[in-house]
Swiss-Prot record:
Membrane topology: Single-pass type I membrane protein
Positions with biased composition (Gly residues): 859-870
GO cellular component: plant-type cell wall; plasma membrane; plasmodesma
Catalysed reactions listed for this entry: L-seryl-[protein] + ATP = O-phospho-L-seryl-[protein] + ADP + H(+); L-threonyl-[protein] + ATP = O-phospho-L-threonyl-[protein] + ADP + H(+)
The protein, known as: Probable LRR receptor-like serine/threonine-protein kinase At2g16250
EC numbers for this chain: 2.7.11.1
Domain Protein kinase: 527-811
Enzyme class per UniProt: transferase
Extracellular topological domain: 29-451
Amino acid sequence: MVDQRRSALGFVLLLLCLVLFFDCVVVGQTQSRFSEKLILLNLRSSLGLRGTDWPIKGDPCVDWRGIQCENGSIIGINISGFRRTRIGKLNPQFSVDPLRNLTRLSYFNASGLALPGTIPEWFGVSLLALEVLDLSSCSVNGVVPFTLGNLTSLRTLNLSQNSLTSLVPSSLGQLLNLSQLDLSRNSFTGVLPQSFSSLKNLLTLDVSSNYLTGPIPPGLGALSKLIHLNFSSNSFSSPIPSELGDLVNLVDFDLSINSLSGSVPQELRKLSKLQLMAIGDNLLSGTLPVDLFSAESQLQTLVLRENGFSGSLPDVCWSLPKLRILDIAKNNFTGLLPYSSYDSDQIAEMVDISSNTFYGELTPILRRFRIMDLSGNYFEGKLPDYVTGENVSVTSNCLRNERRQKPSAICAAFYKSRGLDFDDFGRPNLTQPTSKNASSGISRRTVIILAAVGGGVAFILLFVILPIILVLCMRHRRRAAQRGNNDRPKPAGEASQQPPKGAQTFDLSRLGNAFSYEQLLQATEEFNDANLIKRGHSGNLFRGFLENGIPVVIKKIDVREGKSEGYISELELFSKAGHQRLVPFLGHCLENESQKFLVYKFMRHGDLASSLFRKSENEGDGLKSLDWITRLKIALGAAEGLSYLHHECSPPLVHRDVQASSILLDDKFEVRLGSLSEAYAQGDAYQSRISRLLRLPQSSEPSSSGVTNAICSYDVYCFGKVLLELVTGKLGISSPDNALAKEYMEEALPYISTNEKELVTKILDPSLMVDEDLLEEVWAMAIIAKSCLNPKPTRRPLMRHIVNALENPLKVVREDTNSGSGSSRLRTNSSRGSWNAAIFGSWRQSASDVTAVQAGATTSGGGGGGGGNGLRNSGSQGSSGRNNNNNGNSSSSRRRQSSEIVPEPAAYGVVEDNL
């Protein structure tokens, strides 16, 4: 009996202990979860995040966005795409100290969220469980802490698209579990650490768009699992290591835009899985190995452009089964095109073999390409049917009956040097003797023909040259009058820095500092190729540091190459125009007769083309890019700069080179317009002058000669392509050299409609994370882009109206709901409908339809001939109302309709018709 009581008592005590134990566990978990919730609330406060994402009353593991838990503990935080409160937006900081106590945290993603500041040292001390760290596009600056090498569990490290500087820490070579490493689009300097050779699990290595120098470490050949390798846009030198041929799993191989030298290693033939090989824009030379690619190669893109390759291109390169792009332009390749046939399923996108020395006849192998640039070679014979159309360029060859070909003497000499015959474009040999009678007959006909041709030429010359002489005389008289009004003594020391004789005169004392040639030599290390940023059409750009350590960009212009007109125009522009949206001009050096130098402030984020796009770390084709807020900021900044040139300069200035690469970005992504050497006063280009005199119709597109007419609507068209590039994330839409841009725009524009917002998601950059409000802003920008891309120049909006629209994007797509009366709503709908019709209704109309729309717009304006002016004034009132809200004018305080933000283009169409 006693034993039974003892057993029962023991069982009760055991049960009591278990209850107490589980109670302690539950209490501990509750306290732990509560403390972690407090940590996240502190993080929300320090980063200024909105409470709707992390509400105080919710359970972080259940109700909070971006939180991942395991066994009740927080192990993952994703705040990418989060929006800040109004106060949080005013002063964003890298303030994440509360994370220090989340020792089990294995995932942290803040990509796209502005975190200006340096990465804390304690990241590599307190967060040792981290497996994923993504701080891409976070405005992080400073150096990468050496302690990150302690995060040995790390599998993904993405620090791309920031402002990180100094050396890449060698301690990153200790992250042996790392599979994704992306350091692209920063300002890293120095050499790539040899310790990276230890990262044997690496699948992606991207250090593109930095300032790295020195050789590529041969030890990288040991990274046998590597799939994506991108070292482009740096200053790597020395030959390509043959050890890279051991990367047998490599799919993407990009070493373009560096200073690599030597020949292509034979060992690269082992890269049988390659889909992309880009080694263009280097100093490579020699011949390509014949067996570099096999007939079973998976290669889709081959870029060898702008090197010094010679010899023949291996025949297999033309018939690669999956080839889409072949770009070998600007080399010394030579030989005949192969006569091999192709499979009809092997249609490729583009081939660019321009500026080489290929010769002979064009062969059927070209049938597989949709877009072809064959210019600058020595092809002869007749142009085949399959090499025609607007997507083909064959200029500067030796083709028969084609325009803009090389002189026959040059072609004959080229073929003679190779022991080949040339038929002189198929013309008969005029040196053969003829009979006396035939000679007499030909002579009489010749006299008649020459007389007729001579008379016609004389008439044309009189009709064309006389107006030109009159215009030049008037301009000369006007300039003389201006010089008479502006004569003054020149400052001391200015004489040595005068523009060349015959140039437009301007005041150099207002153009920044006059640098000496020795200063610029020292700043650029004697213009070392390692400091070369890019070769531009108006001069080569070098990075450098002045004596006081200020980073600068120096444009080197070779006057002997005929580039003097561009720099003179640029100096004249800077002497007369000044605006915060133009690239800061620091000075010049004009003391050298054959070379001139212009000095600009260094833009830390380069240009839009290099800051917007980068390859995704995934194997897909997606692009990862700037967040939407930054894109809209860039679009507005560029529009403000162009609006200044168009509307605040007299006469209006046309930029003529608006594209992503001419939109420069400082360290805060503020826009500065560059590439100003092409700027002209509206209507001042030579062809435009002739068109005005003869009343010929003008086009806003480049002419066949490559000269663009200087009218503001051309800038608007190009700006529309930039906006479309920002919306879609498609690389190179705004580039004038991109042959695919026109085709893509024709495919994308039907998805832009003022009536259906969801359509725009079909072309939206997939890397953008946007909520409903932001999607409406995207929609609005797409609508503005489409209006800019109207094929009729007179129906494109003015740039100042585009600025208003980008400042108020939601008003472009939202109807006014503040008005209560039916008549007000009717006016709103009518106004919006007119704007829709102005943008889209005439997209495919003829010129007569445009006139009809203009007449209708004038009539609806309710004032006879004043309808157009009324629309223009409404836009101006809206702008002034934004700056003077207390003037008592009710019209300035009401919400503007979409047609007021960007008035109907028909209202100002007459102005451009008279240009």
